[in-house]
UniProtKB/Swiss-Prot annotation:
Name of the gene this protein is made from: hscB
InterPro entries, per the entry: DnaJ_domain (IPR001623), HscB (IPR004640), HscB_C_sf (IPR036386), HscB_oligo_C (IPR009073), J_dom_sf (IPR036869)
Keyword line: Chaperone
Cited HAMAP family: HscB (MF_00682)
PROSITE patterns reported for this sequence: DNAJ_2
Protein name: Co-chaperone protein HscB homolog
Gene3D superfamilies: DnaJ domain, HscB, C-terminal domain
Organism of origin: Photobacterium profundum (strain SS9)
UniProt keyword Ribosomal protein present: no
Length: 171
């Protein structure tokens, strides 16, 4: 049983987050180890394993990147944890330029405003890449979807670096 089947959801990238959360709470309630406190040792162990599976599946599906990676792994294209280099020089150049721009923000005359504008730009890029990924997954274009996930991970890491810089400004 895959993660989508566990939550009785269609195998597709776009998910109803509310339904996912509702199904998660229901499964958590049903398989919570406390419900099996008086059960046999075997049943208690199975409930702990099931609860762990439910938690893992929920964490995977609620995050768009891990959800896409999971979908690819279900198509025998497991890219989780891979160290493959992206072969898109234009995208890589864009990422280098964005990182340079991020490094220069601290020296701007109004760094908070510059960071806000930069964050808006990166958020738009993230949403655009997410939309492209969804299309590729819907078309079962697994190879291109894998590259889209790799790109999305670059952008997501940049978003994390923006958050870290924000913390230094507002702490």
């Amino acid at each position: 049983m895959n993660h989508f089947e566990l939550f009785r959801l269609p195998f597709q990238f776009e998910l109803d987050g509310g339904l996912l959360s509702t199904q998660f709470r229901e499964l958590q309630r049903r398989f919570h180890p406390d419900n099996f406190a008086t059960a046999s040792e075997r049943d208690r162990l199975m409930s702990v394993q099931k609860a762990a599976q439910i938690n893992d599946a929920f964490q995977t599906l609620k995050n768009p990147i891990s959800r896409a990676e999971y979908m690819l792994s279900e198509q025998d294209m497991d890219i989780r944890g891979e160290q493959k280099t992206l072969q898109d020089p234009e995208f890589l150049m864009q990422q280098m330029e964005l990182r340079e721009e991020l490094e220069d923000i601290s020296d701007a005359s109004d760094p908070e405003s510059a960071l806000f504008d930069f964050e808006q730009q990166v958020t738009a890029l993230y949403k655009s890449q997410l939309s492209a990924l969804e299309q590729l997954l819907n078309q079962d274009d697994w190879e291109e979807a894998a590259d889209a996930v790799r790109k999305l991970k670059f952008i997501d890491k940049l978003r994390y670096e923006i958050e870290r810089l924000e913390e230094t400004f507002f702490d």
